[in-house]
C-alpha cells in the first residue's frame, strides 16, 4: 500500500451511506494529527483521524483522512471546512474513495516551467486532467523565486498518464521552451534495488576517462565533505533523521566529492557526499552517494541528473533503499 491508508479505506462505500470518510488536502506542514482531529470534531463525532506521513522520513505529506460516525456530519464538514484558510494553506475537504491500484503512483514531476508561474497557475494548467490531491512548486530558498519545477499528485494514475501524454514536450503560455512532464521518481523501484545490490556485492569496477568540471553550471560547496580515501566497502547509513540517500552510478575513476557537491547543490540542501574508492588505488569505484534533507528536492535532482553525461560517462541516479544495506 503506497499511501498508508488502505486499512481505513477498504470498507468505504460509494453510496451516500458510506460517505463518512473524508480526505483533507493542503494541510499545513506543521499540523499534527491531534490538531486535525480537533478541527473536524468541532463539526461532529469523529471515529478516526489520520495524518499521512512519509514512511521513511516521518514528515507530513500535507494530507490526511477523517472518518465520521455520521454521514450528515461528514457532509456538513465538507460544506463548512472546505476552503478554510489555515496558516498559508487553503484546505480542500471531500469524500475519499476506496483504495485501489488505480490511485498508486500518480505523482508527477514537471520541469521547465516559466519562473513566473505560481502554484495556482500550475494547478489550473493540470486541473482539466482530473482531481489534484496536492501540488508544490519548488522555490529557491535564497531568492524566493520559482525554480521552474513542480510536483502534482493526481487522484488516479490514469489522470497522471493523460497529463503526461498531453503536456510532456508542450510549450505553456509565456514560455519559449517545452516542459518535461513525467512520473516522479519512486524511491522503492525494484530495478534500482537490484542494481544497487549487484554493485554492493560485486568486485571493484574500473572506469576510465576524465571528469570534466563544469563550474559555470554548478555551485561548489566544500563544507562537510566526507573523504572516503580508506573505504573498502559500502556501508552508507540512511534514516529518517539523516535525510534522503541518493545513489550515483557510472562515475569516472577521477570523480571526487567536489563534483557531487557541484552537481546536487543547486537542487537543495545537501548534508553529505561520499565517493566510494578502491582501497589500493584510491580511485573512484564508479559510484557514490549524496544525502539531501528534502524528498522533493532529492526527487528533482534525480529526475534532472539521471542520464546526465559527466565526461564520457552517462550517470544513473536513483534513491538508495533501506534494503540495499543487506
UniProtKB/Swiss-Prot annotation:
<comment type="similarity">
    <text>Belongs to the RRM elav family.</text>
</comment>
<keyword id="KW-0963">Cytoplasm</keyword>
<keyword id="KW-0677">Repeat</keyword>
<dbReference type="GO" id="GO:0005634">
    <property type="term" value="C:nucleus"/>
</dbReference>
<dbReference type="GO" id="GO:0070935">
    <property type="term" value="P:3'-UTR-mediated mRNA stabilization"/>
</dbReference>
<comment type="function">
    <text>RNA-binding protein that binds to the 3'-UTR region of mRNAs and increases their stability. Involved in embryonic stem cells (ESCs) differentiation: preferentially binds mRNAs that are not methylated by N6-methyladenosine (m6A), stabilizing them, promoting ESCs differentiation. Binds to poly-U elements and AU-rich elements (AREs) in the 3'-UTR of target mRNAs. Acts cooperatively with cribp to stabilize AU-rich sequence (ARE)-containing mRNAs. May play a role during gastrulation. Required for the vegetal localization of vg1 mRNA.</text>
</comment>
<dbReference type="GO" id="GO:0005737">
    <property type="term" value="C:cytoplasm"/>
</dbReference>
<dbReference type="InterPro" id="IPR012677">
    <property type="entry name" value="Nucleotide-bd_a/b_plait_sf"/>
</dbReference>
<dbReference type="InterPro" id="IPR002343">
    <property type="entry name" value="Hud_Sxl_RNA"/>
</dbReference>
<dbReference type="GO" id="GO:0048255">
    <property type="term" value="P:mRNA stabilization"/>
</dbReference>
<feature type="domain" description="RRM 2">
    <location>
        <begin position="106"/>
        <end position="186"/>
    </location>
</feature>
<feature type="domain" description="RRM 3">
    <location>
        <begin position="244"/>
        <end position="322"/>
    </location>
</feature>
<dbReference type="GO" id="GO:0007369">
    <property type="term" value="P:gastrulation"/>
</dbReference>
<dbReference type="GO" id="GO:0003730">
    <property type="term" value="F:mRNA 3'-UTR binding"/>
</dbReference>
<dbReference type="InterPro" id="IPR006548">
    <property type="entry name" value="ELAD_HU_SF"/>
</dbReference>
<dbReference type="GO" id="GO:0008266">
    <property type="term" value="F:poly(U) RNA binding"/>
</dbReference>
<dbReference type="GO" id="GO:0008298">
    <property type="term" value="P:intracellular mRNA localization"/>
</dbReference>
<protein>
    <recommendedName>
        <fullName>ELAV-like protein 1</fullName>
    </recommendedName>
</protein>
<dbReference type="GO" id="GO:0035925">
    <property type="term" value="F:mRNA 3'-UTR AU-rich region binding"/>
</dbReference>
<dbReference type="GO" id="GO:2000036">
    <property type="term" value="P:regulation of stem cell population maintenance"/>
</dbReference>
<dbReference type="Pfam" id="PF00076">
    <property type="entry name" value="RRM_1"/>
</dbReference>
<comment type="subunit">
    <text>Interacts (via RRM3) with cirbp. Unable to form oligomers. Part of a ribonucleoprotein (RNP) complex, at least composed of elavl1/elrA and/or elavl2/elrB, igf2bp3/vg1RBP, ddx6/Xp54, ybx2/frgy2, lsm14b/rap55b and, in a subset of RNP complexes, stau1/staufen.</text>
</comment>
<dbReference type="GO" id="GO:0003729">
    <property type="term" value="F:mRNA binding"/>
</dbReference>
<dbReference type="InterPro" id="IPR035979">
    <property type="entry name" value="RBD_domain_sf"/>
</dbReference>
<keyword id="KW-0217">Developmental protein</keyword>
<dbReference type="GO" id="GO:0005938">
    <property type="term" value="C:cell cortex"/>
</dbReference>
<dbReference type="GO" id="GO:1990904">
    <property type="term" value="C:ribonucleoprotein complex"/>
</dbReference>
<feature type="domain" description="RRM 1">
    <location>
        <begin position="20"/>
        <end position="98"/>
    </location>
</feature>
<dbReference type="InterPro" id="IPR034996">
    <property type="entry name" value="HuR_RRM2"/>
</dbReference>
<dbReference type="InterPro" id="IPR000504">
    <property type="entry name" value="RRM_dom"/>
</dbReference>
<keyword id="KW-0306">Gastrulation</keyword>
<keyword id="KW-0694">RNA-binding</keyword>
